[in-house]
Each structure stands twice: as structure tokens, then as C-alpha cells.
Amino acid sequence: RDSSLTSPHIHLSLGTTATLGDLADRMGNGGMVGIGFHVKQRTGLYWGVQANWGFGHRLREQGVLANLLTPAGDLIDNEGQVAFVSITGRTGLFTADVGWLWDGLGPNPNSGILLKAGAGSFHHRLHFENTEKRITQLEQPQLQYYDRLTWGVAGRLTLGYFHMSNDGLRNFFADLSLTRATTWPQ
């Protein structure tokens, strides 16, 4: 199409995340999935909401389960056997976004460079995966003392490319985002 359109859209996203600052002391890089609803106005204004969930962040923090280990460094399950526990980080980011689309790069005025800013909430915690026997200390209500749940406010800046094809069948976006959050233990 050769004219600028108002276009509401639901989108799914998939990507990777890199941790920095204090969060990098606790967990490493991981994956990310998300869903959002945004509206691109004729004028270039772009606004909406987005939810992202991070998973698979490698644990970096030492001594998370230190008080549950035997003198030999083993974790014992409810049956008295050595337990094998995988610990990863999980995150959640929920934002309301506003931005601007500069057209001129793409097949029509609905494609171009997209700059947006968002504000919302961010949380992160540790996830314990035990595929063997139960470990009572890593179940509710005790789990809350080990999962290191923190929650707080976040801001996000995103720069990317938004593409809307002429036939409406190949719409996509690619971007880089920088998120800054301040969180508190829960």
C-alpha cells in the first residue's frame, strides 16, 4: 500500500537476553518469549503494551543452597539419597510503550525505524528443577526463602525496524532493547 495506515496488531516475540549490573552477579544470559498489543497510528505514533518472560538464565550466584548441603557438599532428598537439582533464573517484564515510527525504509510508509520507550514492572527469581525425589525444603512454603524473588519498577528503550508488507502477509520487527530496573526482595 502506498498510504500510511492505522494498524492495531498482536505480536509474538522470541529472543535472547544478556544480564548486566547486579542481576549479572546472580544469573547469566538466557532466552526470552513475549506477547504484545500495539497500535501504529497514521501519524507514526506507536503505542501499546507488552509482556516478556525470560528463562534458562544460568545461575552465577554462589551458595544459594549452602545451608541444605551436607559437609561433603551434597543435597539430600526426602528419601535420604543424593539429589540433583538444576537451578536457573526466570524473569518477567511488563511494560506500557510509546514510540515513533520513521518511515522511508521499506516498501511503504508503514515500515521504518521504530524508537519506543516503555515503563512498567520487572521481576526475577530462581527456579529449582528436581527430576528425582521430593525435597521438602524446595517446596512451598519454604521455597520462598530460596527463590530470591525480587520485584520492582522498570524502564525500557527499544530501537529497531518495523516492516509491514504491501500484501499484509510478511509483517515483522527486529529490535534491540535496553532495560533498567530497580527491584526489591519480596
Q: Model regions: which residues?
A:
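Residues on the lipid-exposed face of transmembrane beta-strands in outer-membrane beta-barrel proteins
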Residues: 12, 16, 35-39, 51-53, ...
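Short loop/turn motifs that connect adjacent beta-strands in outer-membrane beta-barrel proteins
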Residues: 1-8, 43-44, 104-112, 164-172
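Extracellular loop and loop/strand-boundary signature of outer-membrane beta-barrel proteins
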Residues: 19-23, 80-85, 140-147, 186
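Flexible, solvent-exposed coil segments and beta strand-coil junctions
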Residues: 11-18, 71-81, 133-142
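Outer-membrane beta-barrel transmembrane domain signature
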Residues: 110-186
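Short glycine/proline- and aromatic-enriched beta-strand/turn motifs that initiate or cap beta-hairpins
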Residues: 1-46, 50
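Gram-negative (and chloroplast) outer-membrane scaffold detector with strong preference
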Residues: 45, 52-59, 64-132
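Residues that define the transmembrane beta-barrel architecture of outer-membrane proteins
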Residues: 6, 27-33, 88-94, 111, ...
